[in-house]
Amino acid sequence: MKKDFITKQEQRQPLRQLYMWLKSLQSTLVFMQTGAHPDDETSRMLARLSLGDGMHVVYVNAVRGQGGQNALGPERGDALGYLRTEELFEAMRVIRADIAWLAESSDDPISDFGFSKSGEQTFEHWGREHSLRQMVKMVRLFKPDILIPTFLDVPGQHGHHRAVTQTTIAAFDEAADAKKFDDLELAAWQVNTLYLPAWGGGGGSYDDEVPPPDATHEIRTGAYDAVLGGTYAQIGEWSRACHATQGMGRQVDEEERPVPLHQLRTASGKAVPTGLTQDVPERLAALAAHCRDEKGREAAILAQKAADDALTAFPNGEAVLSALCHLQTALLALEKSVSPRHVHRVHLKMRQAGMAACEAAALQFHFEVSPAVPVVGQPAEASLSWHVADPANAPVISATMKGPEQITCGPFAGSGRGKRRQSMTASLDIAGPPIDAMTGWHGVMVSPTSLHAEVSVKIAKTEFVVPLCPDTVFSTMPVHTGQITPNRTLLRHGQDSDIDMQLQLEATLKPDEHAHLTLPKGWTFDLVAGDSDTKLQGRVTVPSSARQGHYRIGAKVIEQEVFSTQRLAYPHIRPQTRFAMASANIALVDTAGLNGVRIGWIDGGVDEAHHWADQLGAHIIQLDNNRLISGDFEGIDVIVAGVFAGGTRPLNRSMRHIRSWIESGGHFVSQYHRPIDNWDKTQSAPLRLQPGSPSIRWRVTDAVAPVRMLQPDHPLLNSPNRITNEDFDGWVKERGLYFASEWDPAYVPLLAMSDTDEAPLEGSLLAARIGAGSHVHCALNLFYQMDHMVVGAFRLFANLMTPSGRT
């Protein structure tokens, strides 16, 4: 496999990048779309507006995507949120768009807490006022002329989507009211036009109950751009493919795929029948009407001519640079004369002209920090380097660094003058608290809040200033880092009392420092071995008086928390490091074990429930495709089909063998599946069974929704553990999803539950007797509950995994 840096260097496309920046000089409009999750954006529309029309596109996203699935690897929760943050960064880079986040940091209440069915349910987590404040902030920062949410606020749509649409519509007025959220210290901004999508949000997941509004406008995406090598719809899919953890991106042909819009509101109160805006300067020349003197009006006309000349000169770099220098000169004159309401348009064009000039001059900037993730309190260095095509006529480069208040940036000192690759370095003093990789926005219109360099590039006596961020995601490391192992442990109450545990620190402690574990009350730690400067190794003893529950063990050096680190790296995104307080989580559960049970696992790569079966004492046998297709189940007591396993494993081909094995006395457990996971209601289960669609109608999103036992005396709810309503206490995120919507009469529904004001669903847990054996289909989100140490989930899981012919 090629090394990442070689691949990136090989795939550089400076001419394409130059072309994209030159296109951005053709419009002075700002277009903002809002969405809830990374991958909600209407990519082909944004590609057309940005790369076709030259509008400055800003996509405002609410959450980081912590609640999604991961098609690439094991990362879930917060780790997945970091991956999806980077995926959206890459997706927007493809279509040359800025990104802003309502959740500006990893601890923001606007989080991907799980599925919801209404805006009200969503705001219970996010906070309605906080959400609106954040949306108003982004509107005032980026000053869009056109604003549109991604989805409609209608029943049957995801509650996160509905909440974002509500705040987007409200922000149209609120952002223009200087008295609202004046603590932001941002000038009020009136959006010119507000649109809604004129398309429905139905499909396999959602079920809009109200049809979309009539289309008043249309964005056509079928035009082919010979330089970029695709239509805007195709480029949109290149962007969507960056959301690889969500399996996004599909092949589309060169055909027209229009995007219909519905004009909802305008600043004037009058409909705008043609064009997307009214009385807004759409090009540099149009700014002439907003200048206070003739010199400014002439500058606007000259700026427009220079922007046009630069695009016409492409790909002649020398001619492009000449035109860009004329453009920058005109923009400086225009800046002094244009109305304050429109000066941001001039500033944006200056930055975009600077980015274009850097590409035309083939500077190929690199901005690196060493070490890549500096430790708080330890020295670090920043290095800025660039390529010089002609050392005898090299641009004059200078730079200043800016960043959060925790960072003190030294001045840059240059080296390598006269060489093809020149550079400058500067010192960084890093204070606490640690800086997280998640930042509030990325792009060229608004200066980053994270570490960045403001780089001055002088070409032929014309100065351009561009913002540059480090090549890799910038964050800083806490002082003390390490790992506690094992980090997740299941103990059976009354059976297990000791845990062998180790704290491994990543750096040697100072002579006056010492590390210790922080234990629940009454728990003890006996040191067995280890160098106290780097490692503690010993045995944790749980007192007999400890009650069933979830317990946490942490670590400190003196009184400073120890943090664990996780490196996140995939080829399609920039690597990054996240950190969280080091911890070991223990579930102390009053449950029977699975000692001696041989479980054949059909792993779908989504859940790790087999880990918990192993901790309960079962012997796990991972069934490969050959064993499935041949029906080689000799010596296996239970077969489990993991979450979504049918999407990647030959479940349908092997079902006749599984059915025969069940009839001979085997116990089969299937976890929840989507209809898209190659599900066939007559072939994917031993008897007819169908997961419901659209999924919003067949899930219970309220994690504390009441659960009614339809068959309280059924063996599955009584052996080996007696399941009660207490076992459904403390659940997180949701009860379950993709509940069965229809099933063979042989199946017995065991539970009923629903979200508020909805009819009870009975397809969450089904059991059937088939010959001498049995099948249980479980659409409860058990694996997620166990991963979050919910004790009742372990008790029910043990019952599901026990082969006793109880159904």
Task: Cite the ranges covered by each PLM segment.
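The feature marks non-catalytic terminal segments
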Residues: 2-10, 17, 174-364
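Long beta-sheet-rich domains in secretory-pathway and surface-associated proteins
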Residues: 369-588, 593-595
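Catalytic beta-strand/loop cores that center a nucleophilic Ser/Cys/Thr
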Residues: 696-789
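A glycine-rich, often tryptophan-bearing local segment used as a flexible ligand/cofactor-contacting loop or short
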Residues: 647-727
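A short helix->loop->beta-strand "cap" motif at the edges of active sites that frequently abuts
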Residues: 54-55, 189-192, 664-667, 773
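Extracellular ligand-binding/catalytic regions of CAZymes and related secreted enzymes
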Residues: 346-347, 478-499, 506-509, 573-592, ...
